[in-house]
Amino acid sequence: MRRGRNQSAVIIISTFPNKESIIQNVNDLIIEKKLCACISLVPIRSFYSWSNKLEDHEEIMVLMKTTKSLATKLKLEIARLHPYDVPEIIEVKMNDVSKSYLKWMIDSIKS
């Protein structure tokens, strides 16, 4: 699919057990495969039910900024690399993105 200037931007959100589990793949996702323009890591504390038990874990929320045309490839790559049995992989459309930021994103992920 062509990556033109008329792209819409999305954020792919996922959680990982620690920084090391994502940092080892950042260079590959951004530089080599050019699947996203930027990855932000945010420390969080997650509470969730797993096997009928309440879980409480510190995790890293990962925000990956990319274009709609690359979102599916990026989500497949995250699923392939992810250490969890059931990874959280969410796509959110970015609204009201500045033209300069969108241009930078598109330029950053051009082949």
Give the residues covered by each predicted segment:
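Positively charged, small/polar-rich N-terminal and surface patches that mediate targeting and assembly
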Residues: 1-111
